[in-house]
């Protein structure tokens, strides 16, 4: 029973991010600015590297925001979003802390059910790589743009990283 509650909440957290990314074709036009130096950040108590050329938009930062869970499993989410100056490249990080419950591979696989995913290890972290195509629009025609997601467990928390380029995961995730 506890597994089902955690899985449902994890699904809701990931779907929120996926739907937001799909709706904007992961353009993330809400992010702006630029930074020429790489930086190290902490989201939900976990350290990440952000490559040079990306800047965080504080408007989209979440810091231990409590859920409005109706399932009885309380959790908090922390998140940060980054984009380059041209608003063509983006990185989004979300960490879900389920308090007394630990996220497991079984929970993540349940959450990703129905999605095409590949088990992968990035910088020593075993997780799940998902690629989805989102429809964006140029001035004259619709285009298909890939969005990549890497989902894994760290310290019992759910870690979700979304990016416009799969190669960013190796830069963002710290060994």
Q: Can you describe what each PLM-predicted range is?
A:
Residues 52, 86-87, 125, 151-158:
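Short, solvent-exposed coil/turn segments at beta-strand boundaries
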Residues 1-32:
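Secretory targeting signatures
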Residues 35-40, 72-79, 122-138:
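Short, hydrophobic/aromatic-rich segments at coil-to-beta transitions
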Residues 3, 26-33, 43, 48, ...:
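Short, aromatic- and cysteine-enriched interfacial helices/patches
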Residues 108-150, 154:
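Signature of long, low-cysteine stretches enriched in small and polar/charged residues
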Residues 54, 154-175:
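Surface-exposed amphipathic alpha-helical segments
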Residues 36-38, 54-56, 60, 114-117, ...:
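Short glycine-aromatic motifs
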Residues 50-101, 139:
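Secretory pathway targeting signatures of secreted, lumenal, and periplasmic proteins
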